Regions:
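C-terminal and inter-domain tail/linker signature
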Residues: 1-151
Length: 151
């Protein structure tokens, strides 16, 4: 698969909730950053998304591959707008936030732009350009989830 096809396959797998296939498409040392306070391993990002998909069965990422750039086309730029309703328990223990009971509240994020780097036929990094009103914290605020404060 070429870089665009790899990224599209990952996006399609995440949207469908096929996280086994998604894991196959990311490298073992893949890093995710930008919409979370600190960089995390892509395995943690996949677990968060699996749990988000379970808690929000109608979750739609509105993924779109925008273009392919970089040396040999290994940088793929995508966009995403998440929308969903939390009708089930949301497990955020992969990032230390525990379980959140169903709120039956909806959320929608503005369009986020992402740079995905492909190396050796797998996703090596996923970097979200931070934007106000997007990311995990923004979703949790819209759901009415109280975030711990750090003193």
């Amino acid at each position: 698969m070429n870089p665009r096809e790899i990224v599209q396959a990952l996006l399609d797998s995440v949207q469908r909730g096929d996280f086994q296939k998604a894991r196959f498409l990311v490298s073992k040392d893949c890093q995710f950053s930008g919409s979370v306070p600190e960089s995390i391993q892509c395995e943690v990002w996949l677990r968060i998304n699996k749990n988000l998909k379970k808690a929000c069965p109608n979750l739609d990422y509105h993924f779109h591959v925008d273009r392919v750039d970089g040396l040999n086309g290994h940088l793929v730029k995508i966009s995403a707008e998440l929308k969903g309703t939390q009708s089930g328990v949301l497990d955020l223990s992969p990032v230390g936030l525990g379980l959140t009971p169903a709120t039956d509240k909806s959320f929608a994020t503005p369009c986020e732009h992402v740079k995905v780097t492909i190396k050796d036929g797998k996703v090596a990094s996923w970097v979200v350009e931070p934007i106000e009103g997007a990311g995990l914290k923004a979703i949790l605020r819209q759901l009415g989830v109280k975030l711990p404060t750090i003193v």
